[in-house]
């Protein structure tokens, strides 16, 4: 028996102080976005399953249309927004910077509120990353900023005959058993660690390690951690990637990616996690 006060597992309820905080977070982000020439986009909650990236993903909430087309509830706004901008909006607008405030959904009943920014054709991740950092700072939050480069684990796997799954599973124990540069990469945390590693790194890694260092130089943030071997959680992040976290909670993540053959960069703020952090 389902009681009247019960809610589906994974759904979200905000009221009073939590609802006010949620609105304050959104207002803070909106102000920052407009000041940086971003425009808002609201995408449909439903999309054809074939447009959802991995149509075999079991976490997508599925249903059928009246014409028997497979439909999915929005699972990833980055994919949706960039597809709509490149295939539909660009017929009438050449604007490149877009932001959104809307939830995504996953099976069976999980709802995740997000605030995101996407810079279509953005070549440098640094300004986008700094925008995300500044929004959380305005909210008086000081999470750790962790920066990585997905090209580094792929290069290491290629040149060391190590299965990429070792990096994907973050098998630190196995990586530390390897001699030379691999163990050095695991120990990198600070800017000084990274600068030192660049001096002794193999030639095939130097450029990507330097790009990792350069990415952070644009945004001086005290609580910055470098993690060259960190594996990004989203498959379309294949380059520079960053996240901001407190404890086990990720408040923001983003990076450089390619969607619909367009190289872009962006980030998403996880509103639910930020609200919880502000309430604690």
Swiss-Prot record:
GO molecular function annotation: histidine-tRNA ligase activity
InterPro entries tied to this protein: aa-tRNA-synth_II/BPL/LPL, HisRS-like_core, HisRS/HisZ
Any single biological process term in GO: histidyl-tRNA aminoacylation
A cellular component term, taken from the record's GO annotations: cytoplasm
Transmembrane regions: none
Cell compartment(s), UniProt: Cytoplasm
Pfam families for this protein: tRNA-synt_His
Pathway: Amino-acid biosynthesis; L-histidine biosynthesis; L-histidine from 5-phospho-alpha-D-ribose 1-diphosphate: step 1/9
Keywords assigned: Amino-acid biosynthesis, Cytoplasm, Histidine biosynthesis
Family in the record: Belongs to the class-II aminoacyl-tRNA synthetase family. HisZ subfamily.
Subunit architecture: Heteromultimer composed of HisG and HisZ subunits.
Note: This function is generally fulfilled by the C-terminal part of HisG, which is missing in some bacteria such as this one.
The protein's role, per its UniProt record: Required for the first step of histidine biosynthesis. May allow the feedback regulation of ATP phosphoribosyltransferase activity by histidine.
Name of this protein: ATP phosphoribosyltransferase regulatory subunit
Organism for this UniProt entry: Helicobacter hepaticus (strain ATCC 51449 / 3B1)
């Amino acid at each position: 028996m389902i009681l009247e006060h019960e809610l589906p597992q994974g759904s979200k309820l905000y009221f009073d102080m939590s609802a006010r905080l949620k609105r304050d977070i959104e207002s803070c982000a909106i102000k920052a976005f407009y000041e940086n020439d971003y425009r808002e986009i609201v995408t449909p909650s439903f999309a054809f399953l074939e447009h959802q990236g991995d149509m075999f993903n079991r976490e997508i909430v599925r249903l059928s249309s009246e014409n028997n087309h497979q439909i999915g509830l929005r699972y990833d706004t980055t994919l949706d927004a960039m597809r709509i901008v490149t295939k539909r909006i660009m017929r009438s607008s050449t604007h490149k910077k877009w932001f959104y405030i809307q939830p995504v959904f996953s099976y069976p009943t999980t709802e995740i509120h997000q605030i995101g920014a996407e810079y279509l054709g953005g070549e440098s991740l640094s300004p986008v990353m700094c925008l995300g950092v500044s929004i959380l700072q305005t909210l008086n939050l000081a999470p750790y900023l962790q920066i990585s480069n997905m090209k580094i684990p792929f290069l290491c796997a290629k040149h060391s005959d190590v299965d990429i799954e070792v990096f994907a599973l973050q098998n630190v124990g196995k990586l530390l058993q390897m001699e030379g540069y691999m163990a050095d990469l695991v120990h990198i945390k600070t800017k000084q660690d990274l600068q030192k590693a660049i001096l002794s790194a193999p030639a095939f890694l130097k450029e990507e390690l330097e790009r990792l260092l350069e990415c952070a130089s644009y945004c001086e943030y005290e609580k910055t951690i470098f993690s060259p071997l960190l594996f990004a959680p989203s498959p379309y992040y294949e380059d520079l990637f960053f996240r901001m976290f407190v404890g086990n909670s990720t408040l923001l993540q983003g990076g450089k990616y390619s969607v619909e053959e367009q190289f872009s960069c962006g980030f998403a703020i996880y509103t639910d996690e930020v609200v919880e952090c502000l309430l604690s």
